[in-house]
């Protein structure tokens, strides 16, 4: 056995978009979403691992799927999943946001086409399993094609239709480019060794080696089990 955690790594400071607290505390496992569509009110904490409640009150009626194929080809028993989704009296609305017409997107009632990373500015950090931290300043190498829009634009437009107060709370009055600069300024506050925003944009890639040489999982526990049980 193991801890169930992913392999770890050395990473450079990254600041992500702030997320409000989710008011819905009831949870199910990612894998059991088809059960929640087909027999939601029958699912209980004891039998199905429902968290935050003894049982589900209602089934899933709406799916918002962003950049993933969980709907069909990354789920088990595709034929059963297909049959569940074909009954529109169960899950009544599926929205998919993606770059391509994936297997999951074909089941959507609404498809919102997103931009690819090579079509917009962004900053991404290294992922995992390495001793070199880095930041990549993505810059568009081609213009957006057809009617595709950035995910921030899409969500801003959704927020706008929910009301001016929701739109202001979501965007905080910033464009996508302004958010990128705002978040990077917060990164600089935490990590003054980073280059300036304009310097990073010019460099394209910023690298920094792990100052400890390499990452050791549960290092404190390994060094002193009694002090770090």
Segments from the language model and where they lie:
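Extended redox/cofactor-interaction regions of prokaryotic respiratory oxidoreductases
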Residues: 1-107, 116, 123, 209-229
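Short, functionally important structural connectors and interaction interfaces within domains
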Residues: 52, 127, 134, 192-195
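Short, well-ordered loop/turn and helix-capping segments at boundaries between secondary-structure elements
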Residues: 87, 110-117, 157-168
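Flexible glycine/proline-rich, aromatic-decorated loop/lid segments
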Residues: 103-137
């Amino acid at each position: 056995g193991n801890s169930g955690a992913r392999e770890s790594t050395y990473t450079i400071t990254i600041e992500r978009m702030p997320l409000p607290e989710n008011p819905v505390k009831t949870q199910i496992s990612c894998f059991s979403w088809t059960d929640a569509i087909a027999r939601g009110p029958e699912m209980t904490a004891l039998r199905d691992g429902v968290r935050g409640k003894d049982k589900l009150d209602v089934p899933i009626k709406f799916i918002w799927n962003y950049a993933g194929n969980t709907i069909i080809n990354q789920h088990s028993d595709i034929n059963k999943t297909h049959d569940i989704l074909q009954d529109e009296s169960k899950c009544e609305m599926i929205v998919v946001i993606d770059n391509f017409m994936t297997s999951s997107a074909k089941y959507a009632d609404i498809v919102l086409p997103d931009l690819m990373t090579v079509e917009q500015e962004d900053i991404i950090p290294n992922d995992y399993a390495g001793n070199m931290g880095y930041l990549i300043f993505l810059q568009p190498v081609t213009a957006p094609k057809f009617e595709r829009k950035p995910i921030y634009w899409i969500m801003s437009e959704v927020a706008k239709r929910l009301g001016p107060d929701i739109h202001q709370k979501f965007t905080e009055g910033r464009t996508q480019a302004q958010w990128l600069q705002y978040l990077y300024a917060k990164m600089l506050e935490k990590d003054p060794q980073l280059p300036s925003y304009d310097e990073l944009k010019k460099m394209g890639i910023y690298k920094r080696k792990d100052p400890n040489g390499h990452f050791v999982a549960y290092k404190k526990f390994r060094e002193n089990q009694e002090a770090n049980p």
